[in-house]
Each structure stands twice: as structure tokens, then as C-alpha cells.
Amino acid sequence: MEQSILDLLRAGGFILYVRHGEAIVGEDQPYFNFQYCYTQRNLSDYGRREAVYYGQMLRYWQIPINSPIIASPLCRTIETAQLAFPTMYIQIDPFWFEINKLGGDISAREQQQILKNVQSQLEKTPPFGTNQVIIAHSFPNGIGLGKIPNMGTVIVKPKGEGNGYEIVKQLPLTDLATLGNSLYK
């Protein structure tokens, strides 16, 4: 039986893993500091508008969101969370910065450990009737949740701790406007 993604999200029980809004061109400084945004790539003006729109769409569709919103400690993810969810508490979780390491030169063992930790985070079921939002970073192609566009969302269905998770759908930001027409089989 087909159900709309919107109906599923309104019922709750999902993790919405979201990549931050568009950032300025360039790279984080080699020895950046989480406390100093000027050492990092930050949101562009367009990225700020994307974040505001994202939050507006979730409120428009009346998708229940659990508080706190979880964000990586980089300024671009924190600002994305603040703009999308201005009235909600934001919890900074340093673990989600680890996703950035997956695209770098790390050992297979370190990569496996990061992915194992991602799995354990994505297995956690949110409180009944709500969805958990995590705002972090894209993964490299073919690793973890894969490449995610700016403000793209991977809808994850946790199966409980130790039982894995299912990727329900990946939605680019533009698909939020037509969420009621998107089906899950």
C-alpha cells in the first residue's frame, strides 16, 4: 500500500538528517576553531534563505519536530538550525563533525568506527509522535547516507538500538513544496 511521505512524517518516528544550507565558496581554514566562525566556511545569503524556507515548509506541513534540534558544531550547521527553527532549543553534538572526516585521508578502521557511530545514532527512535532533526554534513558518494545536496533531507526510519535503520527517501529542498504528492511504497 502506498502512503504519502507527508502522512508518515506527520505520524512521527523518523529522523530527518539534513545537510546545512549553501556555504560560501572555499574551505575551512586548516586549523579552524569551532568558537571562531571566521575560521570556517559559513552560510551564504542564499544558504540563509534556504534554511528559513526549510523551517517554514516543515511548519506549513505541520510535521511534528522533537526538541532539541541536533547540530554539528560548525557555525554553518548551527546557523542553519537557528534560522530553520528559531523558537527551538539547539543541541550541539560534536560527533556530527566526524562526517567531514569521511571525505579525507583516514584509515579504513577510522572510517568504519565513524560509520558504526552514525548507525548507532540513526537507530535511536525519537519520542512518540515526533521526528528528530539532525543538521550536519553530506557524506561522500557511496558512503553512509551518500551525497546530500544543500538543505537536502534524508528521511531515516530507525529500527531501534542494535537493529539498524532504513533510508525511506532523500528529498532535495525543492521537493518540500510538493511533499503531499510524494509517495512511499
Say what each PLM segment does.
Residues A108-E123, L179-K185:
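A polyampholytic, Gly/Pro-enriched intrinsically disordered region
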Residues E2-I106, G146-K185:
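Active-site-proximal alpha-helix that buttresses catalytic centers in soluble enzyme cores
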Residues G13-I15, T130-A136:
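Generic beta-sheet signal
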Residues P126-F128:
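Feature of secretome-associated and extracellular-like proteins
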